[in-house]
């Protein structure tokens, strides 16, 4: 079911656009579809035919996704394993301070060598209402004021569904446009489509290396944009929407944590409308990769920050409960072994 299908379903019951908007907003807030307001009861607003049909509609919406299991973490986050109607599972993560990370695909085709999700390949796309349903399930547990499309999958490979979900959340869902974050490895179609959207989300770009060849090996199926081209396209969008690009950099010890790489970041991002997010790798048992030592991470942040690039450390939420993308699902269903890329540091 997509957004237009839901509106048509309600229209078939006799709902006018005003009725549809109220019902959809109630669902997006995790409330009953016929939830009343302080001033108006449902029976005084919704036609009888609509009220009689809502239980069936509610049943259909509940069937889109259900919570399979919840895994609270010590940092205040909570990882949700969500089961879709065909019994495929995706992950959502409730973040501290009102954030939620949602999945856009079951699996992923990009095949980032340090990502658990990519090991299974792409199994199927997640529909727009399946993404929104992840928000609904989360809102039944706590307030959600920000949604980041950074979970399982590459949003650019499911662009129509992701943009539809963003539009719905940024309108009837009541989430500010800056608080909807589209994360991508850098598909040219993203830079073509986002500027023309009614809801223009913030953009997070997966950089991970300033060396084009190393980035190609780390992200083997990403579009063939050079780091320079990626940053240039990001800067253009940032100036159009007037909020900075978030650049993502998963820190891998001995792979992309050298000063040469940090100098590459300075070369690309100094003077840009950008924030660099350094993300220490979240390892699992038997991993081929490790995160740098804590002292090293602090050194890198200071090195970049003191030279003019706003830099933050973004630890994966829920590190004590399989916090990395796809890890919870992988433990539940098994995963393929990890490939390892070695880099000689100068």
Swiss-Prot record:
* Any single GO BP term: rRNA base methylation
Q: Which domain of life is it from?
A: Bacteria
Quote the subcellular location field of this record.
Cytoplasm
Species, as recorded: Pseudomonas paraeruginosa (strain DSM 24068 / PA7) (Pseudomonas aeruginosa (strain PA7))
Q: How is the cofactor bound?
A: Binds 1 [4Fe-4S] cluster. The cluster is coordinated with 3 cysteines and an exchangeable S-adenosyl-L-methionine.
The catalytic residues are 91, 325
Task: Drop me one GO molecular function for this one.
Answer: RNA methyltransferase activity
Per the UniProt entry, the Enzyme Commission number(s) are 2.1.1.-
The Radical SAM core domain sits at 94-320
Protein name in the entry:
Probable RNA methyltransferase PSPA7_3453
Q: What UniProt keywords apply to this chain's record, in alphabetical order?
A: 4Fe-4S, Cytoplasm, Disulfide bond, Iron, Iron-sulfur, Metal-binding, Methyltransferase, S-adenosyl-L-methionine, Transferase
User: Where along the chain is [4Fe-4S] cluster bound?
Assistant: 108, 112, 115
Q: Name one Pfam family in it.
A: Radical_SAM
Q: Does the keyword Iron apply?
A: yes
Gene3D superfamilies, A to Z: Aldolase class I
